UniProtKB/Swiss-Prot annotation:
Assembly and oligomerization: Part of the 30S ribosomal subunit. Interacts with proteins S7 and S18. Binds to IF-3.
Sample GO molecular function, one term: structural constituent of ribosome
Keyword tRNA processing: no
PROSITE patterns associated with the record: RIBOSOMAL_S11 (PS00054)
Protein name per Swiss-Prot or TrEMBL: Small ribosomal subunit protein uS11
Recorded GO CC terms: ribonucleoprotein complex; ribosome
Amino acid sequence: MAKPTKKTGSKKTKRNVPNGVAHIQSTFNNTIVSITDTAGEVIAWSSAGASGFKGARKGTPFAAQTAAEAAARRALEQGMRQIEVLVRGPGSGRETAIRALQVAGLEITLIRDVTPLPHNGCRRPKRRRV
């Protein structure tokens, strides 16, 4: 007969991280918010899809706001107070995600746009004709 296995608790440890970096990746289809410490270790993350939105609604500013609020709530539980914000991508949820982080109680010290721009690299996809 098999031995009963021991139940172990959650492997997540509560860390006290006073300041970190919020990475907001905003595409036309989704918005992903990752909050890391200064070394780059992810402390909290959320996305529009993880917040319960499906399909075309994931790309809306309200979905980005909801995702940012959820990530900020988890970061505040870890003791985070100040963040720098790095925004990447052309999506519609950029400004609302930043505003949601601020309203949630995180002090924003820096906002930087780190959208990658090609120096004429790969060929663009052909234009849509609708």
